[in-house]
């Protein structure tokens, strides 16, 4: 579970109020619950890494090469991608889809709560400079839409986008695929950043 910029892993517990949800799930499943990991993707309160490798840190490598193997070795977690998901809020939501589409060999499920359409730190040019040290090829390597087009159809991968704002272009994009954007939020659409 990955928070946004200006968040800490503890925010899932404090402001996210996740403990009653975990307790209810555990009670409903005979005392069994998933291993939940509240990760720090930035190393500090205001380091907006967007979970990429770049001048702000090697966050992608930290999450895929340090955190995941550690959880497997220290907690006996399964290494099967079908048993791994990434959930995130804001920047963490962007991280969730990015990590999953880039590493379907590691993660099979994501929940993107109010994430951006891709790693973002200003305009596209500003993002390339700030997150990738000016390397435009790295921007493309971490852009979810570019990654998905290059990968082709995914098998065994699923995701959930939760936002109170209808994603820009969602109606046109989903219409050509026979679907329409929906919100599971009791508030409907209207809120934070949008995935498109």
Where are these regions (language model features)?
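Non-catalytic cap/lid and distal C-terminal segments of serine-dependent acyl enzymes
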Residues: 1-196
């Amino acid at each position: 579970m990955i928070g946004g910029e200006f968040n800490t892993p503890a925010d899932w517990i404090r402001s996210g109020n996740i403990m009653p949800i975990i307790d209810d799930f555990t009670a409903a499943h005979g005392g069994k619950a998933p291993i939940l990991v509240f990760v720090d993707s930035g190393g500090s309160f205001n380091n907006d890494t967007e979970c990429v490798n770049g001048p702000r840190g090697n966050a992608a490598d930290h999450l895929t090469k340090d955190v995941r193997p550690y959880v497997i070795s220290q907690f006996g977690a399964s290494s099967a991608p079908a048993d791994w998901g990434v959930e995130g809020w804001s920047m963490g939501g962007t991280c969730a889809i990015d990590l999953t589409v880039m590493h379907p060999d590691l993660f099979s499920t994501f929940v993107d709560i109010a994430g951006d359409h891709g790693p973002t730190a200003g305009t596209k040019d500003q993002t390339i400079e700030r997150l990738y040290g000016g390397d435009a090829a790295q921007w493309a390597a971490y852009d979810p839409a570019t990654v998905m087009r290059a990968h082709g159809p995914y098998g065994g991968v699923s995701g959930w986008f939760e936002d109170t704002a209808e994603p820009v272009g969602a109606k046109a994009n989903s219409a050509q695929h026979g679907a329409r954007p929906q919100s599971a939020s009791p508030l409907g659409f209207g809120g934070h950043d949008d995935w498109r």
